[in-house]
Amino acid sequence: MSFRRNGNLSSTLLLIAANVLIPVAIVIFATGFFPYKPLLPGLAQYEPLDGYGEPPEAPFDKLVFMVVDALRSDFVYTTNSGFKFTQSLIRHGAAIPFTAHATSPTVTMPRLKAITTGSVPSFLDVVLNIDEGDESSSLASQDTWLAQMKAKDTGKLVMYGDDTWLKLFPGTFDRADGTTSFFVADFTEVDHNVTRNIPGELRNDDWNTMILHYLGLDHIGHKGGPRSPHMVPKQREMDGIVSQIYKAIETQDHLKSTLFVLCGDHGMNDAGNHGASSPGETSPALLFISPKLKGLQKNQDSPLPDAEDFQFYSTVEQSDLAPTLAALLGFPIPKNNLGVLIADFLSIWPKKADQAYLLHENARQIQTVISAASGTKTFDGALPAESCASPTSDYEQLACEWQGPSNNLMSARVGDDMDSQWALPVVTWLRKAQELMSGMASNYDMSRLILGQITALLAVIFSLSAAIKTVSPTRSLTPLLVISIAYSIMMFASSYVEEEQHFWYLATSTWFGYLTLRGFKRANTTFPAHLLLTAFPVLASLRLLRAWNQTGQKHAGTPDIVKLFIEPHPHFLWLLVGLTYFWTHRQLVYSFHGRIPVPINYPVMTGLVLAAFTFKAAFTLEDAPELVVEFVKSSLLDFTRGASLIARARAVFVGLGLVAMAAMGFILWEMRGAGGNRKRSRRKKGPAEAITTLQHLYTILALTQSRTANIPVFLIFNLLYWFLSSEIDAPDGTGLSTVELGISSLLLQYASFFAMGGSNAISSVDLSNAYNGVSNFNVVLVGILTYVGNWAGPVWWAFGTVVLLGEIWRRDQRQKRLGSGNNGKRGSDEKEEEAEAKQMLEGGQISPFKTYVAVTTLFTAFSVAAVMAACTILRTHLFVWTVFSPKYLYCVAWSLVQHLVINVGLSGLLFWLGSF
Amino acid sequence: MPLVDPVTMSSSAIVKGAVAQSTSTTKSTPGSQATESSTTTAGSSSSLATLRPVQIKQTPAAQTVRHALPAALTALYLLRFDALVTNPVPVMLNALPVVAAFQMTYALLCLPAAGEPASKSNRKPRPGEKKKGGDIGSSTIITALLASVLTSIVTPFLYFAMVLFGAPFLTHGSHTFLCAAHLALLTLFPLFYVHGVDSAAWAAVGGFRAPLDETFGGLVGGIVGAWLGAVPIPLDWDREWQRWPVTILCGAYGGYLLGRVLGGTLFWGKKF
């Protein structure tokens, strides 16, 4: 018997080991997969270049940098654009147009980093983009053209628009007015707040850099896509601002040497979203505007016909902005720049020596970056000829190829007579260096990738053996293994990663089809038609969930229930939303019934639910006003008029916290009383019911953090939950087993995530509820709110599972008591008897919670190992940064937060509280 | 029924024969017997525990048809595949009567009709028996017609089941419905022909307790095949055949044929 006890202990130890190894593997792998790029510290200075004189004189001294968020190239350049004035500038040569290639991830913060530093931001910046308060994403300490303009000390820096700039450059701007983009329904106010500052600033002559960042066009894209009826009017509005600034430059003396740059930070796809790397998303417009540029004689055709690939005029890299601005405005190129001076502007400098200087400075600066990255001093002296015959690394190859361009520069410097194409080899070399340094493939730390992989495989082995030891009979693990293995295989195909929801939908429907129809096994003679009647609502619920939000990549934006039935019928939506809140209210009141007197219970819970509901209504009025019906506006919002959204959200959170504390108080109080006879009647149910209170309180939190159109989904969840609960006490002792519940929970957690609009794309992270009740940015709070906002469904199912696990536990306790009463009848199975004897010796059976953790750990270990293997093997795949890396980040969220924190930590705590 | 309980609970301990015995003792009460139209006419072995695998008739015609028809179905499918990909609805519609004729021939020639003694070859013909195996009498034709009526009744339900498992609901209605009709004709028609509306037999089929044979094997294969047919749809290969419902139909046919052949040969009589 002591051996058996050891068996239980060893399975617990294996389980703990697996759960320790999972985060360890994730961290090791991440450090190898997202390598930390060495950043050169400090501000670049002009260093004397051998043989050159002073740096060439810059044609401009002031900069107006106007960013229009999501300004895709065709919005400016094509026939149906609203930028008529800008197009006339292109025709007259006063505007030099480009298509600036933006690398993935095409979201604002990494793009601004690329634009200002000239470097290619690491993929981790995406995470930091969400986690906007992170200090390490701040560029205040890095070398950027803003820092250089400030160091020039020829004027102040002013900024109006998206407050991402303020977060990236704290303390840099002398005058600033940041706008936030919480509500994408705001098309006008957010831009008006920028525009109203322009006339005054154009009259001021105390600044040398003015940054304007307009968000309205991006909002229109998110809301209505690139063909929204608001799009062209917004373009005309932006065109008007271009005209306003250009005319000021033309007419006002203190602005005559002003360079005006108009650009988008990224583009958008046909659905109006961005984040990935489709041509639409990676092709923003970029224009350099000034009357002085007419001298370049670059008069180009405009407008142009539509282009499928969004490439208009010549295409440059977004990072090329940094060295080009450095040359045009006369400051040293930022230290970590990988951009290449745009050669079209070279002819501004009439002397070849000046042109050579600028190119040479660019090359030398990139060589410094290469030397830092490769850890060698490749460019210090001439390389021995033999090592150039067979270069050992890409870096060496590059160093060898430097000879030719370097000779060209030398000749240009001394004024040799050369053909007009002399600069071409230099630019080609620079592009090559840029490509090499931007491609991160060479930066993987293979040993760490493999170490992480091995650790994850160990976690798989541990969790597998723990599950086999914990679960009996072992064959009940088969469905879980099939799911885990199929999922693991799927991770290697990019389209299955993009369309992961189909896997969960099909698996969930099949599994619930099995659960509802397994009663056929009990039915011996008669055809159990009633089972079909149970199966129908359950499967229909799952079908509704599947169709609620269209997610994934391929068919993103195609009709779904939200678009077809919810948005056109707001009355119907609010009926369902009201029903959801009403139902939660009912359950909340019921779970407190008998604990607190009705006169207190009822008003308190009503107040809490009403606060949550009015917050949701008020939030929707800001976020999606077209969804709010008159009834909700007049009846519910009017009597709480004046309360700000932050105050409303805080009221909800504080109320939830207080009621949760009360519920916890009841649990602890009843736990204490559980020992005495006095509370005997309540002993079985007391804390268990308080746990359901916490479950309902979480439901309110989940509703608060979910999009309004997703709220009715919780009614469907309730129906499925009710089915699972009824299956626990199915007749004939064939009730739901813990493993079956674990599998159901796993499937529903994933299916609900996708059903509520989640996907494996970074762009699908929903930030609309991330700032509820938060006025000052707080990483922890915003992080939690973001997580609950996106994983509302999965966390709901984790709560639900704990309550159901408690029910299973009590059912088994009951059956054990019954079984020990008439052991003779039940003891037909020798094994079972033995197991029972063992359990009695140990004073308890295997806790259902342990079995549940074994189930979720097994799947998590499999998924982590599979995603790592896919990322390692496909690290040179075209989609590694757009499909597999985002999947890795999602996998991290699922395994660290959803598995470890929610399914193990939170559920464990709740199960423990409820088991007294 | 108190006796059911020990049976279900002790399935692993008692050998199968014992289960069968205890079940048949439960079932041999006259009341329950009378309400069922059972697969066999023999009294003591009428209950579910002895639901026998369907045996293909031993006549030369039956044996020829048994092997020829799967080949013919495969050939038909391969011949029409390109047309199916470009124009699924008319192709499925036109193929329906052909497949129906195939299945009808198969049922009439090879399968024992419901109500007919199931496994004559195993036992001596009883004295009261009217027909010899292999004859296509009027009663078997009526059984076949009834089976086809039942198949068409069940097709809408199959359609809804497919929708519940993710088939498009608002679009592609005729695609899915025809696909369901094909699936029903392949997998359910033979079962209706051999079991009729015998609820015990259908409960056994639904509970995956029926022994494998050509009919049940075909059902399992067809449904699993159709289910697996959904797998390649999300792949980004952008092929024409990835369109709804080509892969589903392909899986259904492949699975059905495989299940039918394997169920009739290698796994005949085995249970899950």
UniProtKB/Swiss-Prot annotation, chain B:
It is found in: Endoplasmic reticulum membrane. Keywords: Endoplasmic reticulum, GPI-anchor biosynthesis, Membrane, Transmembrane, Transmembrane helix. Pathway: Glycolipid biosynthesis; glycosylphosphatidylinositol-anchor biosynthesis. Its main location: endoplasmic reticulum. GO terms for molecular function: mannose-ethanolamine phosphotransferase activity. InterPro entries: GPI_biosynthesis_protein_Pig-F (IPR009580). GO terms for biological process: GPI anchor biosynthetic process. It is a multi-pass membrane protein. The keyword NADP does not apply. Residues 32-48 have a biased composition (Low complexity). GO terms for cellular component: endoplasmic reticulum membrane. It comes from the Eukaryota. Residues 21-48 are annotated as: Disordered. Pfam families: PIG-F. Residues 21-31 have a biased composition (Polar residues). The chain crosses the membrane at residues 91-111, 145-165, 177-197, 215-235, 248-268. Acts in the GPI biosynthetic pathway between GlcNAc-PI synthesis and GPI transfer to protein. Belongs to the PIGF family. This is Glycosylphosphatidylinositol anchor biosynthesis protein 11.
